[in-house]
Amino acid sequence: RLLESSPVNGEKNLSAGNLTVVLTYDQRLTLPADARSKITIAGATVSEVSVYLTKATILITGLENGKTYELVVSQGAVLGLAGVEAPRTTISFSTAEAAGPPIAKLCTPNPLPQAQKVYDYLFSIYGEKVLSGAMANVNWNIAEAELVKQATGKYPAIAFFDYLHLFASPADWIDYGDIKVAKDWWDAGGLIGAGWHWNVPNVKNGVEYTCTPGDGNKNSDGNWTTTFSASNATVDGTWENEVVKADLEKMAGYLKLLQDKNIPLIWRPLHEAAGNTYEYTGGKVWFWWGYDGADAYKKLWIYMFNFFKEKGINNLIWVWTTQTKDADFYPGDDYVDIVGRDIYNQKDGAANAAQYSSIKATYSGKPVALSECGSVATVSSQWSAGARWSFFMPWYQYNATGLDGHEHADTAWWKDAMSKDYVVAREDLPSFK
């Protein structure tokens, strides 16, 4: 028995081109040899059919704008336990009317020319190629990118960093004012990206720093939590606002160092705001910036955006990270250039592609990126299923010395990715100078 479908029956305004349909049944499935011949759609093509546990995944190609389609899954196209034939199912859906060509306009007014060139390039290859990326091992380094080079012979296109130790910089162990590692990467032809695990005091005048919401004490895992309120963060006169203004002032100075060298930055702050609250009963918000809800979060995002604009920071390409069901957290098209999705522990390429298709349909006109990933399906299987990410970036493994056995993306995963002609390595990038 069919339990649910994605898209749902009667769904409208889906994107043209490719569509991944996922049907969830009430028992484990198998496919008969003639499965594909029993699944039809007039005016388009059923290109791939696969099953995994209770899910049947169907890749449809050749969808045109402004049309209504009916997918017919005939009786016996999928089999349940003991070979019992699943009954006939039909899923109706329609595609959106054709829109004008997307405009590669950054949300930052008068952007740095190099930032605009990067964004133009992302638009020009979107849907045809995907940029590879690697995350720094905690601090200012390209350790993981070097491991990718050792394993595959190629550097990833983007080196990502994290300003999580902003509160401590400059120090003898971390100094974001020393941009040599970023500048060297840029000078070698690569792109730069950065996130910000925004650590704040655990309480007013506190000396412990964290981004985990709580009562200001250690949690059951032994990690500090903070009472820092996102609602107060944008309100003058609060201690939270004083921290925010000081941190943004400090961050603006570090961003300006890159800007002064004409280095654009793919900027991904305030990520994963909704946590998994929309995914599971009893789900949690992971970071303080999402703890007070969507309205407080959006005010904080726009506050940061306007703060940097007033400081003359114009080298940023703004990436907002969705949790797929959190559209109320979206800051708005005027404040976002790319929509990212962080996916972990999902080895089914079609399931990843289904998330991509859903995000692309929800935030039309914005490139969609796999902004973080770990232990996911190979890039080739995701691509074949229709996931045309703008870029991808596996998370780092602390102090990894090689990719064999890497917890997020091992040697085989990276070799698969970097062997594909649609995956852009650093050596494939044009000059943006």
Regions found by a protein language model. Name each.
Residues 17-50, 76-79:
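Short, surface-exposed alpha-helix to beta-strand junction/turn motifs within ectodomains of secreted
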Residues 96-164, 168-176, 183, 380-381, ...:
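N-terminal module-boundary/linker segments of secreted carbohydrate-active enzymes
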Residues 134-135, 268-271, 301-327, 366-376:
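Aromatic-lined carbohydrate-recognition surfaces of secreted/lumenal glycan-active proteins
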Residues 161, 326-349, 393-395:
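Aromatic- and acid-rich polysaccharide-binding/catalytic face
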Residues 168-303, 310-313:
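Substrate-binding cleft of extracellular glycoside hydrolase catalytic domains
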